[in-house]
C-alpha cells in the first residue's frame, strides 16, 4: 500500500480504479477527495451498476484488475456476494459500487457534500 504521505500515488490508484469501472460500463462514476473533510481515507470512488449482477461484476473487476495492474489488494471487502452495495477498502481510497436504488436511498454524495469532486482522467487504466 502507498504511504499516506504519497498523495500523488494514491490519486493515481483511485483514478485507475475509476477507469476500470468506466471500462466495465459503470454509471455515474464520481471521485471525491476527502482531504480536509475526513481522516479515515483520502478518496471515495462511487459508482452504480445496472443490476445486482453488474454491481458484483464491477466490484470483482476492480479487485482483480487492481491486483493485476498495481499489486494493490483491498484491505476489506463488503457486500460482494449480495451485489447491492459493494465496498472495497484500499485504506487510502474506498470504492463504493451501488445498485441504483440503494445509491438513491443513501445519497452518499450528499453525506459528503463538503468533499471536492475530482475530475476523472479518461484512460487511467492504460
Give, region by region, the residue ranges found by the protein language model:
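A short, glycine/Asx- and small/polar-enriched loop/turn
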Residues: 38-42, 89-91
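Short hydrophobic/aromatic beta-strand micro-patches
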Residues: 46-48
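Short amphipathic alpha-helices in soluble, non-transmembrane regions
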Residues: 58-63
